[in-house]
Amino acid sequence: MELTFASYNIHKAVGLDGRRDPDRIISVLREVDADIIALQEADRRFGARASVLPRALLDDTRWRPLPVAKRPRSLGWHGNALLVRRDIKCLHAEPLDLPTLEPRGAVLAELDLRGEHIRVLGAHLDLSGLRRRDQIKAILKQCTRRGKMPTVIMGDFNQWGRLTGAMQAFGMGWQQITPGASYPSARPIARFDRIIATPDWSYETSGVHHSATSAAASDHLPVWASLRTA
């Protein structure tokens, strides 16, 4: 079974022109056309933490959001949301608290794809770097708690080095896929956005989605990877 996973920090749908334009984000998602998508900064930061992507817009797409929000108007938890193809069955979904000096979290879901069960997580890690390693360890602890399953972790790791610093917390048992430079979208130099997979997956291909729309829609470009269950 081959699936395309994507991670996209949508910057609260505010583009490089300073306009909040959720339609533009939806257009980028359609261009990428992944099966499973992790979004970061999908909710406003203050007040009711309302989603920046109206449900009516999502209803017009091939994806549905998974129930990981703690607030009724939010799409995700601390801005982390998961979208999946409508034919994918959700077995379990939950928000995760992470050790932090600033508001950060992750989201976890277990899915049924025609009898094959997989786990996906979305995360947006600490900007300062002071708790990033602890946050990765907390995510891995939650995976252990839920039991062994083919797993993919996606998100904005805010880490410059591919195998340095906090990324060393993953150890040898994880495939670290860094599709390419995705930040800032106008002239990408940083590889903050990554996809991490257990050895259950066979890596096929990956990339950074760069188009006229994606270059303007957010300060990050979306990244994607095609993986096949081994």
Model-assigned labels for residue ranges:
Residues M1-I36, R44, A48, R64-A230:
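Active-site regions of metal-assisted phosphoester/phosphodiester hydrolases
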Residues L53-R62:
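Glycosyltransferases and closely related glycan-assembly transferases
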